[in-house]
Amino acid sequence: MRNLLFSNPHKDPELSALASCMPEAVYPAFQDAVTAHGLLSSDDFSLLLAARLLTETKESLSSYLDLSPDLANRILRQRHACSSFSEFALQLKTKEMTYTRISRALMHLLLNQKTLYPAGYNRVLGFRKSAGALLKEIKRRSSLPLITKAADAPRLLTGDALAAFESDIQASLFYETVRSHKTGTPFVHEYTKKLVLL
């Protein structure tokens, strides 16, 4: 699916080619979401990555999740050749380090993620109205706090759970900023997003 979506970055993807890759009931919702919100690829973060690399040292790079001292050295040697996120990740790839791992490390760098927090909460992004009783039961039985409204999280979470939530929110805001600039659509803060009800 990713190859079909991003095979030609200068042309809108042919969404109908993806219809056979997903359940029939999902395709209309997918099509609506892409039309309304656009698509982002890792290359949409290229300028931000290039700017961020200018301020990093070997020590600071090594402090990010998944970023080893060896990868930090390679990044520093090649950082001025960062023409795009995906091309830079390919340049950094070795037999020992996959493109996927490097991409993940570069995203951790962009998002300033240095700590991997344990799962400390569950967050509901949407549900069917008919499943209200099930949601209530999950909330009652869950050992983790259940977040249905992002703005309530600081009141419901503490410690690592709150830190993990804040890290997730920061990543969402980062994504939303890039999406908003790329598509020319209004920025929507994570705390104001509505729960999706079907």
Pin down the residues of each PLM region:
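Active-site cores that bind ATP or allylic diphosphates and position pyrophosphate for catalysis
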Residues: 2-198
